[in-house]
Amino acid sequence: MAALFTTPKRNDKTSGAHFVEPDVRRRTLLAHGSWRRVTRRIVVGAVCALTVSSLLMPSVSLAAEWVDVGGTQYNAGTAAGDAAGTWSWDGADDMKLNGYNGGAIEAAGKLNVSYEGNNTVTNDNGRGIKVKDGANENAELNIQGDASSTLNVTSSRDAITSVGNINIDGAGTVNATSTEHDAIDAGGDVTIKGSGNVNATGDSDGIRADGNITIDNSGTVTAKATEDQGIDANENLIIKGGGKVEASSIKDNAIWADGNIEISGGSQVKASSEEDAAIDGKNSLTVTNASLNASGVGYGIYVYKGITLDGATVTVRASSDGGEASALFTDEDDIVIKNGSTVDALAEGRFSVAISTSNFYSDEAGGHIYISDSVVKAIARYAETGGDGPDHYSGDQNDEIIPESEGLNIGIFAQTEKGITPATISIVRSKVTAEGDTAAIFALAMSADGKAIGTIEIEGSTILTPEGGKVIDYRNKEELSNGDIYEAGQTIGTGDAVIDSPYNEAVAKSTVIVPPEEIKPEEKPGETKPEGSKSEGTKTTKTVAAAATGAKTTGILAATGDTSSAAIVAAALAGTAAIAAGAVVSRKRS
């Protein structure tokens, strides 16, 4: 039997597709079940450094050195404004807008803009509001307005921009629109606070910062993009304050962060992309006591360094017409769902996983999924074709020699090779509903000696469906030109046999795992139970893999065979595990 999970090296010759050690950080499934290697995303971002000139810069005076309003420059030290009182500047750092309707505003140094009433800044051939470094002062732009006031900024280039930080505060509404570039762009950090609303619409990015983006706001922040990201943070993205954040992009990620993504404090975040992942991050994602709704193409959520959902409500959708789809995925780290979280993940594609993690590196500790005291629904299937229901590729498999393999779909999937510890899926006191056209739940470990075994552990919960369902073992061996690869893991299924194919009829395509309080066995007439007794269905179960030495499965390893039906589908499961791919390119900046 050919190995199910390995990808051959260039010089290997085998009848199947199988796993070997990947030599790149990011990988993807091929439509026919094998892997192609792609380079890991190289993020092009600003590198912050102190220059000699900044070290020698004299102490700042915290005031704009000059301002330019509608094409006329005014120097510091003298107050300025128009006769109608629609704008005024105190000659230092404070500017007031009250019914302003005019051209671009620019300043050197620090500028505080407060607005009242309805204000409009327009520039069809440049930036709207721009602050740059002065000769003796770094750029900083602060914008604030009251609840009944609006600031509209429309321009061809960046609408609101600063070489340094941008701070938006207050209860007013800021509408920033760029027809060719970013709506809001900072060379430093972007911070949005208060209770107001911010609507940023850019042809490039909606909201972008070379530093951190912090949204600590109880109002609504909307960031829309066409070519690039809705929200683009070259460092960390922090969302808190209990408000609503809606990010979207047509051609790119709705949300991208080169650092960590943290969502908390009752915030409600919605991210959607029409052509790419909804959320893409180079580090970790943490959602604590907040809600997140993400919908993307190829990926719903993809981050490299772990996902933690703590008291969170998360809905994720990923689709791909005939291709690869992964709803909730992390590479090289763990997925932790805990403390009353509710997670609903759906992936539709020829090769798809709803919740998945993978780890292929010996110095990394990831590749595990931990679910405790939570409710999780994970469904992976092939996209519907307009008929009565979705096409279930795995249902097309039969006992023919070398049948055509058309796809693979797994609800919850963990995979490791060379990791510090083997793949583990742990379910504790939780309700888990998992469905996959191929398998509902699968844990897989690969090694050169067969000692690493992927495990499924269930504690404080019971397998309700399928009837007679249990954790069953998977074993396979692939003989490659450079040595043998052993694949060992577990899945949910029926029977006592050790399987060597995910398409085995013993594998459960749908499973429901529930804590004791959700099991209500029928009471027989006249039956009484002693106080404190438990029904059979409420017994706590814990299942782990047997030790490699002396285990009942020792010696039951499928050998490579040219006529094996598993040979054609061999790499499909593997590819699904690292579905996290797609060639991600550097974002060019103007």
Which residues fall in each region the model found?
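Sec-dependent, cleavable N-terminal signal peptides
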Residues: 1-63, 590
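C-terminal low-complexity, Ser/Thr- and acidic/Pro-rich disordered "stalk" regions positioned immediately N-terminal
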Residues: 501-562
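Intrinsically disordered, low-complexity polyampholyte segments enriched for Lys and acidic residues
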Residues: 9-13, 21-23, 217, 289, ...
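Sec-dependent signal peptide cleavage junction
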Residues: 56-66, 558-566, 586
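A composition-driven surface/loop motif
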Residues: 5, 60-518
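Ala/Thr-enriched low-complexity intrinsically disordered regions
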Residues: 6-7, 14-17, 28-31, 277, ...
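A cross-kingdom C-terminal cell-surface attachment/processing module
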Residues: 565-587
